[in-house]
């Protein structure tokens, strides 16, 4: 007869390539086991949360395309939104804006994903006879996910846009899933002399449900509309 348990907590941070980007992971694991004569009972519980943040500094590739001699600040030391304008070849070719990704540090910004999950597994086994065992188990998993991206109307992505109703963007995705399963089994083994008889039966039922919602909108004249 014995009761055993094991508790584990973990945390990790993986910095991204760009400043203020990265992924944080947190987890908790609890394992219980109880044995008494013919009985063996086990339960395992796991909780996990993972969050990833993208950098307000933009992507690394944006900086590799910039001329290192561009002046990135004005006379007051503040980052400018526009670094340069280049004319396209040909008649009526127009111009291309060379934007400053550092300018977006002044703007309201949000870009992250977050996932949370709970997993619980339960199992019970009984040795009714020396050669006859019966077991049953159940498991349930529940998870949620969320993604949000908000860019201010002053973000450099909207620099060439003149229509105020198309300046600023917000997108959000949420999802949840629940799955469960229940099983039962019986096994019988009989040995006599050189002969062996084995019988095994198993019954299982499971279900999985998923739901998701995706939203996106453009036109945010107020930076506080992402709250």
Question: What residue ranges belong to the model's regions?
Answer:
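Surface-exposed loop/interface segments of Gram-negative outer-membrane beta-barrel transport/assembly proteins
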Residues: 1, 16-18, 27-119, 135-227
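Transmembrane beta-strand segments that form the barrel wall of outer-membrane beta-barrel proteins
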Residues: 8-13
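Long hydrophobic segments that form regular secondary structure
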Residues: 125-130
């Amino acid at each position: 007869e014995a009761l055993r348990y094991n508790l584990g907590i973990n945390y990790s941070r993986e910095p991204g390539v760009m400043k203020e980007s990265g992924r944080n992971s947190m987890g908790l694991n609890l394992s219980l086991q109880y044995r008494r004569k013919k009985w063996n009972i086990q339960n395992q519980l796991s909780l996990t949360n993972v969050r990833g943040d993208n950098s307000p500094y933009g992507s690394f590739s944006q900086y590799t395309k910039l001329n290192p001699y561009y002046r990135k600040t004005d006379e007051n030391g503040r980052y400018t939104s526009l670094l340069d304008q280049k004319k396209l070849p040909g008649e009526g070719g127009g111009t291309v804006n060379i934007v400053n990704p550092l300018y977006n540090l002044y703007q309201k910004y949000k870009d992250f994903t977050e996932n949370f999950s709970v997993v619980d597994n339960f199992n019970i086994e009984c040795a009714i006879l020396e050669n006859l065992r019966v077991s049953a188990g159940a498991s349930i998993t529940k998870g949620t996910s969320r993604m949000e991206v908000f860019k201010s109307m002053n973000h450099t992505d909207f620099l060439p846009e003149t229509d105020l109703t198309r300046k600023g963007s917000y997108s959000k995705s949420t999802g949840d899933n629940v799955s469960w399963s229940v099983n039962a089994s019986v096994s019988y083994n009989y040995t006599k002399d050189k002969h062996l008889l084995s019988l095994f039966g198993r019954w299982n039922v499971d279900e999985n449900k998923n739901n998701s919602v995706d939203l996106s909108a453009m036109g945010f004249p107020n930076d506080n509309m992402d709250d």
